[in-house]
């Protein structure tokens, strides 16, 4: 399988804290059981830092875009607004997309709605089921994987 890792708001936050306030890293990572990202001195291990720092904000495929949050279609150069790609919540179809679908996350969405978007061959497919949002009910709390070739949706219930 080809996997497309993306820069998102959590990655941006981690990089920001790593550079601006490395002493805050433990506070950020401990509740997430992610202290293994840190070296003995409490800094992000260089291999992880380099990997995260070099993540792209989006991928342009033949028939779709993959992005963490979405695109700011209210500006001329939508594909240069990296803040929006990591943080935006609402965006719309625009001719700048050249008919491509947008597959994104960042906004927890009911599994039933995600399935409907896929079945309807929607131009927007949100692949965020709020893996850590199990408190929202049984329609949330899954890690989602979408196979671009087979159009199959896979999900794993949060077991933490």
Region spans (language model):
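The start of beta-strands in P-loop NTPase/AAA+ ATPase cores
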Residues: 3-4, 63, 101, 123
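Catalytic metal-binding/acid-base residues of hydrolase active sites
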Residues: 9-11, 70-72, 108-109, 130-132
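His/acidic metal-ligating clusters that form di-metal
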Residues: 41-112
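Active-site flanking residues adjacent to catalytic metal/cofactor-binding acidic residues
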Residues: 7-8, 67, 105, 127
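Conserved beta-sheet core of the metallophosphoesterase superfamily
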Residues: 81-156
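Short, function-defining helix-loop hinge/capping sites that tune catalysis or transport
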Residues: 16-19, 76, 114, 136
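Active-site neighborhood of divalent metal-dependent phosphoester bond hydrolases
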Residues: 1-62, 89-92
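A short, surface-exposed interaction/processing loop segment used at functional sites
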Residues: 158-160
């Amino acid at each position: 399988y080809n996997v497309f890792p993306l820069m998102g708001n959590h990655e941006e936050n981690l990089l920001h804290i790593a550079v601006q306030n490395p002493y805050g890293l433990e506070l950020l990572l401990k509740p997430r059981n992610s202290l293994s990202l840190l070296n003995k001195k409490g800094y992000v291990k260089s291999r992880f830092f380099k990997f995260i720092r070099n993540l792209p904000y989006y991928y342009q495929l033949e028939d779709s875009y993959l992005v963490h949050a979405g695109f700011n279609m209210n500006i001329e150069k939508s594909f240069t607004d990296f803040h929006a790609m990591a943080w935006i919540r609402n965006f719309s179809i625009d001719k700048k997309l050249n008919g491509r679908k947008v597959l994104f996350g960042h906004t927890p969405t009911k599994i039933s709605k995600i399935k409907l978007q896929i079945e309807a061959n929607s131009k927007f497919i949100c692949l965020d089921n709020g893996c850590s949002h199990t408190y929202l009910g049984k329609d949330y709390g899954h890690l989602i994987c979408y196979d671009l070739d087979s159009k199959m949706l896979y999900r794993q219930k949060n077991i933490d």
